């Protein structure tokens, strides 16, 4: 691969990393808002099935990005993006905390109480979300490469979905458990929240599989990659 293509591959990697980090940080900032998504009118234990945090919306994109990076750039580069995303999340929390300590003036359109209620609501939840997410992403990457090696780079849909389904279940189950343990969510909502969150992520994962195929095809054509071949960046 010539230097021009290596530069292009590196630039695309940085863009994907930027999208990943932005999605991760945003999900940790917006998770307190709850929305409803009712493709099916289903009640479980008296609760509508798809009542979800808006923080769940960017998550499927992050798993699509790490799967794409895993496929094209390899496991090491995927791990680097995940670790960088965690540091970015921690840094964003530090910035928010520092901002909360600066008193708002009377003319400020946002007073201290409003600012703190939005950005400092349940810091334990943010911490739990980040730690759980880190765990789930590393599971996703390792399962993805296990299937990639086992199938010799074939059956992209298999490793994409198997890795995502497993890691998303771990993520959903663990975060809901921790939020209930911290007293942030009621215990009687455990089953509904786990099922709703996991099913939503599964549905989105199934829909993103064609996009993964498309992006992988574009990469292979642009960089003349064989099935299972990865771009090696320094």
Spans of model-derived segments:
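Transmembrane helix-bundle signature of multi-pass membrane transporters/permeases
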Residues: 85-86, 134, 157-169, 194-201
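Short, highly charged, low-complexity non-transmembrane loops/tails of multi-pass membrane proteins
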Residues: 218-234
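Membrane interface segments of multi-pass transport proteins and intramembrane proteases
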Residues: 147-160
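Transmembrane alpha-helix/helix-exit interface in multi-pass inner-membrane proteins
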Residues: 89-108, 129, 133, 137
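Central hydrophobic cores of alpha-helical transmembrane segments in multi-pass inner-membrane proteins
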Residues: 57-68
